[in-house]
Amino acid sequence: MKEQREFDLVVLGSGGAGCSAALAGTALGLSTCLIEKALLLGGGTADSLGTIWIPNNRLAKEAGLADDHDTALRYARFVAGGQEVPENLEAYVREAPRVLDALLALGVKLRLALGLPDYFAPAGPGSCADGRRMVEPELIAR
């Protein structure tokens, strides 16, 4: 018989969201298991140069880059092309900056990925030339 184990939290996928969920669970004292089907970690985040899209964030503001909730939401709606669930998109744009702050507080060394504009900049409504993409340099270096 195969070994059986129990966990408080099981996370499927090791992209930015999965790793963030596993880190948060561990920080809360939960026994956590992160499962990835691929040979390497990173999921969809690895496909986007290891970046996470976090609009209207404090690191960009500290760097003097302008952004706001409504502009970011306009761009997110453009990218979704009418396929979004409006409440989910609104929640992402509203909560992503808070998630960034929580990850930074846990010691994740996310930095602005300067020089990487939104995918549809400058033509996309609400797009930003800089400041919305985060990267964890130590993970990329490995």
How would you name each of these model-derived features?
Residues 9-34:
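N-terminal Rossmann-like FAD-binding beta1-loop-alpha1 element of flavoenzymes
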Residues 3-7:
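Core beta-strand elements of the Rossmann-like FAD/NAD(P) dinucleotide-binding domain
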Residues 50, 65, 103:
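Switch/coupling segment of Walker-type NTPase motor domains
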Residues 54-91:
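Glycine-rich active-site loop/strand segments that organize a redox cofactor
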Residues 93-142:
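Conserved redox-cofactor binding core of oxidoreductases
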Residues 49-54, 129-130:
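Short, hinge-like loop/turn segments at secondary-structure boundaries
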Residues 26-48:
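Glycine-rich FAD pyrophosphate-binding loop
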Residues 14, 37, 56-57:
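Active-site-proximal beta-strand/loop segments in catalytic clefts of secreted hydrolases
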